[in-house]
């Protein structure tokens, strides 16, 4: 049973990828050169054997270098086009919608009724947060107690 079927996934030893995982040269295909798809392509490359520690220790450095080069390549292309596109550019996600932070920003911040309301609600929120922080324990006490709890449970487990 040491020989595998010729059609099996593992028969080739993992060398039948269209691009090897340590091929660090910047790609020129449209999927990774487009800054909108850059997040997808780099996270896709991280999957597989690299996330399960099946490769030697120095190969993680090589694959990380490749991801950086891919990002640099996309940035260079944006500069050649004359900056980012008007419709949001790299800030947009895959479906062309802006991310939540950009969506919530108001274009005209100088309108007086908006700024006064905004600062008022922000001030109220911080006041409430201060009240709730005064009631709770300090971080030092919390961490001390959690360490004690851990130690006690370890001692209980030993017995």
UniProtKB/Swiss-Prot annotation:
Residues 65-82, 125-134 have a biased composition (Basic and acidic residues). Signal peptide: none annotated. Residues 1-139 are annotated as: Disordered. Residues 9-31, 105-119 have a biased composition (Polar residues). InterPro entries: SMG1_N. Pfam families: SMG1_N. This is Putative uncharacterized SMG1-like protein.
């Amino acid at each position: 049973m040491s020989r595998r079927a010729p059609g099996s996934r593992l028969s080739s030893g993992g060398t039948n990828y269209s691009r090897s995982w340590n091929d660090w040269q910047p790609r020129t295909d449209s999927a990774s050169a487009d800054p909108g798809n850059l997040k997808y392509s780099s996270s896709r490359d991280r999957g597989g054997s690299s996330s399960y520690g099946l490769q030697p220790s120095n190969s993680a450095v090589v694959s990380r270098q490749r991801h950086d080069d891919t990002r640099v390549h996309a940035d260079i292309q944006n500069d050649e086009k004359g900056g980012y596109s008007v419709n949001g550019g790299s800030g947009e996600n895959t479906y062309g919608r802006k991310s939540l932070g950009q969506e919530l920003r108001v274009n005209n911040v100088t309108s007086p009724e908006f700024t006064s309301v905004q600062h008022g609600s922000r001030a109220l929120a911080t006041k409430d947060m201060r009240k709730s922080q005064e009631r709770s324990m300090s971080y030092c006490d919390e961490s001390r107690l959690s360490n004690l709890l851990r130690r006690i449970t370890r001692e209980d487990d030993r017995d």
